[in-house]
Design a protein with these regions (language model features):
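Beta->alpha loop/short-helix hinge microenvironment recognizer with preference
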Residues: 1-237
């Protein structure tokens, strides 16, 4: 039995293929999703040794794009993240980029990894600045979202970071104040430097324009919100 999403893509498959010209990975995931649960693609037969009843279970596609398999993946992922969160107050932060940079990540998906590298370096530096000898280390989880609420391409990083960290002495130190000026400027600098290193001299003009148009850095949401880590992991997962 097909679901609504499968029916939509089956009805408009050729339009998607010949008008939108999606990437190979997109086509592969759509194909898998369309055929998910189709008995003609195989399955497993289970039998009860007591009553003699047999049940055939068709194979699933295991694609995150699939509304059935993707939901299971999301549940497993959020469960895994919840086990890794330390018992401390956390802050939900969102790191965004200049709209002019978005097409670079759309055309080369490998660049998305730079977002993680940039955010990670900023978080470590923010805690390091508090006490350079102790070098406090926080606990944090980074999750990439590639689309905004309007469903348009808008890669950004959601970060769940502990409001405190462990120092070299083994002591825990709380951190309630997050310096917005530092976070915005540091993230802008870290990301643009990484992109220039990856893209070469052709990126220099774009980099200079970003500094000129974003003198206060890229927008970052990091307000104190007393977030419930379990609720946030469900959202960002």
């Amino acid at each position: 039995m097909s679901n609504v999403l499968q029916d939509i893509f089956k009805d408009h498959y050729e339009e998607m293929l010949y008008i939108l010209h999606p990437r190979k990975s997109v086509i592969e995931n759509v194909d898998r999703m369309i055929n998910c649960g189709d008995p003609s693609f195989g399955g497993a037969m289970y039998g009860c040794s007591k009553c003699g009843t047999f049940k055939f279970v068709p194979f699933r596609c295991h694609s995150r794009f699939c509304p059935i398999c993707g939901t299971k993946y999301s549940i497993d992922r959020t469960t895994s993240m919840s086990f890794k969160i330390i018992n401390a107050q956390h802050r939900h932060c969102v790191f965004t980029i200049d709209s002019e940079l978005r097409h670079f990540f759309l055309e080369n998906r490998k660049l998305l990894g730079l977002l993680f590298d940039a955010v990670q370096s900023v978080i470590f530096r923010a805690f390091y600045k508090d006490n350079k000898s102790e070098c406090f280390t926080p606990g944090f989880i980074l999750v990439l979202h590639t689309f905004g609420r309007d469903l348009k391409w808008n890669p950004h990083i959601h970060c769940l970071v502990s409001e405190g960290g462990i120092g070299n002495s083994g002591l825990w130190r709380s951190k309630k104040h997050f310096n917005y000026t530092f976070l915005r400027n540091a993230f802008r600098t870290a990301l643009l430097d990484l992109m220039e290193k990856e893209l070469g001299v052709s990126f220099k003009k774009v980099k200079a324009r970003c500094y000129q148009e974003h003198k206060h850095g890229f927008y970052i949401y990091a307000k104190p919100n007393k977030c419930n880590p379990k609720i946030v992991t469900k959202y960002i997962g």
